[in-house]
Design a protein with these regions (language model features):
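PAS/PAS-like sensory domains
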Residues: 24-28, 72-73, 82-92, 105-106
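PAS/PAS-like sensory domain cap-loop motif
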Residues: 47-58
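PAS-family sensory modules
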Residues: 1-36, 119-131
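PAS-family sensory/regulatory domains
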Residues: 59-70
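Sensory-domain boundary capping and coupling elements
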Residues: 107-109, 126
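PAS-family sensory domains
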Residues: 34, 94-100, 113-114
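Conserved hydrophobic beta-strand signature of PAS-family and PAS-like sensory domains
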Residues: 38-41
């Protein structure tokens, strides 16, 4: 049993707290659907400020919009393999801002499962590790 089982009002409060934590995080956060192309459904303010893409510009698009000439295909293969197996992925990649400038990003991508334990979305936690 969890606290949600004892206090239904706490669930609503917890959702609001988590929404605020995500929106005001210093790290870039993206949520995508678990379907071909992994369309983006949410990015936080830190993501928009860092990449230059507003939420309106990126929601519905593939995260591949951030990739470019120096993004390693082998890394993307490992990423896709992990996602297809429903596993957490952790790695670093060279990606690109809207203005074309490159950055090195550390990623952690976590599958989000629905009530039937089927992956419905992915949570991508990102941070700039450019040296």
């Amino acid at each position: 049993m969890s606290i949600f089982d004892y206090d239904p009002n706490f669930q609503s409060l917890m959702i609001r707290m988590l929404e605020n934590a995500i929106e005001h995080s210093f790290h870039e956060i993206m949520i995508t659907k678990a379907e071909p192309g992994y369309p983006v459904v949410y990015v936080n303010k830190a993501f928009s400020q860092f990449t230059g893409y507003s939420s309106e510009e990126i929601v519905g698009k593939s995260p591949a919009i951030l990739q470019g000439p120096k993004t390693e295909p082998a890394l993307l293969d490992r990423l896709n393999q992990a996602l297809s197996e429903g596993r957490l992925f952790h790695g670093e990649a060279i990606n690109y801002r809207k203005d074309g400038s490159e950055f090195v990003m550390e990623w952690k991508i976590v599958p989000i499962k629905n009530d039937k334990e089927v992956t419905s979305h992915y949570l991508a936690l990102q941070r700039d590790v450019t040296k």
